[in-house]
């Protein structure tokens, strides 16, 4: 109780079961900045992977991954700005909140795309290349139908989609980069604690954003190091 009283201006009460948490102005600002600052690095990083690509398939994969990465930070930033400054536009805010939730599904699919597209897979495992996008489409439909109604179910979908392709990736003959992939996944899972702690921990959602940024950086490093060329090769091609 003493902790809550001390930080009351930085945190509001928890949201009802079927409602959305209302951040304080401080939390709104933190939510915006923690992802806004990552938009440019995401764009630059995506362009770097495209530049390092050897063939058309690697370029396509770089664009898929890059678009998912950039979309995550852009949509999140726009939603939090609208939620902070234009909250009176209920319909607009609701639409962007849905987009913010839907883009997570496609970001998960895009994050696995380099591993599924550029590594040799067995006949059964290769089906995950398209099945993960089917899961993303299913998650999008779920958001349209049940947005904010069953939060635990939504969280279960995110975690299931995040872990399912990992089972396939770990079965590949070439295991380079899997430690970084697992490390990033663990960081995402730890961040979920803060994702579900609005109204309990001040700036919980902004802290969740930092976990997302850290995990995404670890995964990007693994993709850059093990699936694309080294900086030395890149400089040679300039």
From Swiss-Prot:
> Which UniProt keywords are listed?
Endosome, Lysosome, Membrane, Receptor, Transmembrane, Transmembrane helix
- Report the SS bond pairs: none
What GO biological process term is on the record, naming one?
regulation of protein localization
Spell out the coiled coil positions from the record.
none
Q: Which residues lie on this side of the membrane: Cytoplasmic?
A: 1-28, 83-101, 146-151, 196-198
Recall the GO molecular function terms of this protein's record.
pore-forming activity; protein kinase activity; signaling receptor activity
Regarding the membrane, this protein is recorded as: Multi-pass membrane protein
* A GO-annotated cellular component: plasma membrane
Localization in the cell: Late endosome membrane; Lysosome membrane
Q: What is its main location?
A: membrane
Known tissue expression: Exhibits relatively ubiquitous expression with preferential expression in mature (in vitro differentiated) macrophages.
Asked whether the UniProt record includes Transmembrane helix among its keywords, one would answer yes
Q: Is Ligase set as a keyword in this record?
A: no
The record, for NCBIfam families, names:
hlyIII
What's the family? Belongs to the ADIPOR family.
- What is the name attached to this protein's record? Monocyte to macrophage differentiation factor
The organism encoding this protein is Homo sapiens
The protein's gene is named: MMD
